[in-house]
A protein has these predicted regions:
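Bacterial N-terminal signal peptides that target proteins for export
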Residues: 1-8
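Bacterial N-terminal signal peptides
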Residues: 8-16
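Alpha-helix boundary/capping residues
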Residues: 14, 76, 256-259
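Structured, acidic catalytic/metal-binding patches in enzyme active sites
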Residues: 20-220, 231, 265-275
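A cross-kingdom marker for long, charged
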Residues: 215, 219, 223-277
Length: 277
């Protein structure tokens, strides 16, 4: 696997950490002569008067993508969100700063990756713009202790999961053009870098999404989200959004179908809008 593809795979995992039900269904690239757009899906499912929308997240995007989402989320009775260790957010609560050395150690590497890619791509980080204090936000992910314990139990790490995603791919990802990547980085042309990474990111989500099952990063976190969903349904909520990385959604869609939900609508939101030379 080339270094350029590894960069794009890491970016795809951040969107996780869319013929058939594969991740290619939930994230796509739309190209024209003038530009290209990386888009995430909003797919709607219904059962017995209950509406559930899967809203695909990408954790580095254009600022206006997140600004639109903050307004869009107001339409839901409850909005279930992903964030390992985010149990102190949502429900109108102000963020609580908790000193947790284990959490700092686990997330230090990811924070460096986020900051590096934000600068290289000229994008904005999700965590800094999404309003996680909103009244209708409900945490639907593992706590940091749950996440760490499950990874230890299964011998899983972020690195091992990435490697497995690359090995298990049914088809090779499209390699970015290394010369174009370097030219973009050296000249500060973030548009060139994004154009090269778009397709590999979308295909990387497909590879990651294919690994649903007995793993922590996709399978166990999705199971926790479905537990929270069932609780909200039991509390008579009728209009529910789930804001999660697009790579989670092939497995999550299967879980919804087992619950009797059927897909009834789809729309696409533009996360990256890049003009070509």
């Amino acid at each position: 696997m080339s270094w350029a593809r590894k960069v794009a795979m890491v970016a795809s995992l951040l969107a996780a950490t869319g013929e058939g039900s594969v991740a290619g269904d939930f994230i796509r690239v739309k190209e024209t002569e003038d530009g290209a757009k990386l888009q995430t899906a909003v797919f709607g499912y219904e059962k017995d008067g209950i509406r559930v929308d899967l809203i695909g997240a990408i954790h580095l995007a254009d600022r206006k993508y997140y600004e639109f989402l903050n307004t869009y989320f107001e339409n839901y009775d409850v909005l279930l969100f992903e964030m390992v260790g985010g149990e102190n957010l949502g429900g109108g609560k102000k963020p609580i700063m908790v000193e947790d050395p284990e959490k700092e150690d686990n997330l230090a590497g990811l924070r460096v990756i986020y900051e590096t890619m934000e600068k290289a791509l000229g994008l904005t980080g999700q965590a800094g713009l999404i309003d996680y204090t909103a009244e209708n936000f409900v945490h639907a992910d593992l706590t940091m202790k749950e996440f760490g314990a499950l990874q230890k139990e299964k011998g899983e790490s972020l690195l091992s999961f990435m490697i497995q995603a690359g090995i298990s791919a049914e088809k090779p990802s499209r390699d970015p053009n290394t010369l174009n990547l370097m030219r973009g980085m050296l000249t500060g042309r973030s548009d060139l870098v994004k154009l090269e990474l778009m397709h590999t990111m979308a295909e990387g989500d497909e590879q990651i999404g294919s690994l649903a099952g007995e793993n922590v990063i996709i399978g166990d976190r999705n199971a926790k989200c479905m537990e929270v969903l069932e609780k909200q349904i039991a509390e008579k909520e009728k209009n529910i959004g789930i804001f999660y990385g697009a790579a989670h959604f092939p497995d999550m869609e299967r879980r919804l179908e087992k619950m009797g939900f059927e897909r009834v609508s789809n729309k696409w939101l533009t996360a990256w809008n890049v003009k070509k030379e």
